[in-house]
Amino acid sequence: MASSSFLLLATLLAMASWQGMASDPSPLQDFCVADMHSPVLVNGFACLNPKDVNADHFFKAAMLDTPRKTNKVGSNVTLINVMQIPGLNTLGISIARIDYAPLGQNPPHTHPRATEILTVLEGTLYVGFVTSNPDNKFFSKVLNKGDVFVFPVGLIHFQFNPNPYKPAVAIAALSSQNPGAITIANAVFGSKPPISDDVLAKAFQVEKGTIDWLQAQFWENNHY
């Protein structure tokens, strides 16, 4: 009986520990500004000497000024993470501005390390995400100025501007100093080196010629 109780306790502690490690680690001091030049390799960045820290380590100028030029898929992502603001190190948050051309989109992608909460600043967006296997349930919504939508961590999601005449702008907050992004089309058809067309033809149940054509396209590196 004692052995069973000990095993149960150990299991619960292990689960609690795993949950604690499932997000960015909590800071153990007021701040830990990332030392981008440190040779020390850690999960994140080593701390800059607090005596060398100044206000600019917590600052980034002009995120909401002029509209950004959009790319081939009709969007432009301006990411502010620990690489742009070293003071974000250990704080578990980052932010992005997304500009959408008329009929532009931020294509299906995932953030492996972060939940995202999106707020529409201008225009209208059609957004959605898909749950994991086996259900693959699709949740979608049309958002207008001021509306907010959440994309759970790790799930495939997208945003699309359905207006053929007007652009749209949104701000996204993400629950990691470095959320990462995997744009699905880029990863599958634009990997370097390419995934075997035998593998992809079987996976998508199409001819290898179709896969070869897809892999030959220019895949836009548009993600955050």
From Swiss-Prot:
The keyword Cytoplasm does not apply. GO terms for molecular function: manganese ion binding. CDD domains: cupin_OxOx. Residues 62-212 form the Cupin type-1 domain. One of its GO terms (cellular component) is apoplast. Plays a role in broad-spectrum disease resistance. Probably has no oxalate oxidase activity even if the active site is conserved. Oligomer (believed to be a pentamer but probably hexamer). Member of the 12 germin-like protein gene cluster located on chromosome 8 in the major-effect quantitative trait loci (QTL) for fungal blast resistance. Partial suppression of the 12 germin-like protein genes increases susceptibility to the fungal pathogens causing rice blast and sheath blight diseases. This is Germin-like protein 8-11. It comes from Oryza sativa subsp. japonica.
